[in-house]
Regions:
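Ligand-binding beta-strand-loop-alpha-helix segment within the catalytic cores
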Residues: 19-35, 95-169
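Conserved small/polar residues in nucleotide/adenosyl-binding loops
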Residues: 256-259
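Glycine-rich beta-strand-to-loop/alpha-helix junction loops that act as flexible
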Residues: 73-78, 172-176, 239
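Glycine-rich N-terminal segment of FAD-binding domains in flavoprotein oxidoreductases
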Residues: 64-92
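Glycine-rich anion-binding loop/nest that anchors nucleotide
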Residues: 171-173, 216-250
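Class I SAM-dependent methyltransferase SAM-binding "motif I" and its flanking Rossmann-like core
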Residues: 181-225
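N-terminal glycine-/serine-/threonine-rich phosphate-binding loop
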Residues: 2-70
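Active-site histidine-anchored catalytic micro-motif
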Residues: 68, 83-84, 92-115, 166-169, ...
Length: 259
């Protein structure tokens, strides 16, 4: 929305009509310059709980139809509140994940998936270890595979996603340089799962996990832009003022991709 707001909005400072339009006309005025639909919430918890409910509804609908629900999920801080609410719904409301397929969006390379600072380990500790998902329904890029097998490995990862009917919901954060998963700004729209070299900004950000820059892997196996946008629903999460400028670029500005 064409309004300079934080994800922590103080109601005495900003009128709700600027982020919670009352009718279709007000919404059309506020969103007329948006390239993608955008919702603003008063708090992280409110926004995260809404997305968790949307995910839970899709899981239950798929259960009733006797079908898998395929989720593409990241690690990182942005989705942590969503995962917390999903765990609560599992424990307190009986939400089952037995019909859920999870694909990890990316993994550092070279790095074992079992490493304490792997993205997969973060995803397990934040969500997967606390729900009743079948372990055979969890898939992650393997950061320990041989270099000469990466191309074929990535092709098979895409093939496995398609074998389950594609992704139902992709959950994303956005990096400080505007990356989704590890697709940097300007990545090809038709890119699929592949090995990429991390730029300096991404490595510096990742070094917080690995302790030092020297210990930080130089590359990552990541789902591509086409893989992510092929999902039936995509939720991009951004909390706090430090993401405001990046979200403005995503929502209001023209699209640019590399050749």
């Amino acid at each position: 929305m064409k309004t300079n707001l934080s994800s922590q909005i103080s109601l005495h400072r900003v009128s709700p009509r600027y982020y919670r339009p009352e009718n279709a006309f007000e919404k059309s005025v506020l969103t007329r310059l948006e390239k993608i639909p955008t919702d603003i919430y008063e708090s992280v918890e409110e926004g995260a709980n809404y997305i968790a409910r949307e995910i839970a509804q899709t899981i239950r609908e798929k259960q009733k139809a006797g079908r898998f629900c395929v989720l593409a999920l990241p690690g990182g801080d942005s989705p942590s509140h969503v995962y917390t609410e999903l765990i609560r719904m599992h424990k307190e409301e009986g939400l089952s994940f037995r019909n859920v397929i999870v694909f990890n969006m990316y993994e550092y390379y070279p790095l074992s998936p079992d490493a304490i600072n792997s993205n997969f380990n973060a995803l397990k500790s934040m969500l997967l270890d606390h729900i009743d998902i079948d372990k055979q329904n969890i898939f992650t890029p393997d950061g320990s595979i041989a270099k000469d097998t990466i191309f074929e490995y990535c092709r098979l990862y895409e093939q496995r996603i398609e074998s389950f009917g594609g992704i139902d919901i992709a959950l994303l954060g956005i990096g400080r340089v505007g990356n989704i998963a590890f697709n940097e700004p300007g990545s090809r729209l038709n890119s699929t799962t592949r090995l990429i070299l991390l730029d300096n900004a991404s490595r510096n950000e990742a070094s917080k996990i690995f302790g030092t820059l020297d210990n930080t892997p130089i590359s990552s196996i990541t789902m591509g832009v086409a893989t992510i946008l092929g999902a039936k629903k995509v939720y991009l999460l951004a909390w706090g003022e430090n993401k405001a400028a990046m979200i403005k670029e995503c929502v209001d500005c023209l699209l640019y991709t590399s050749d």
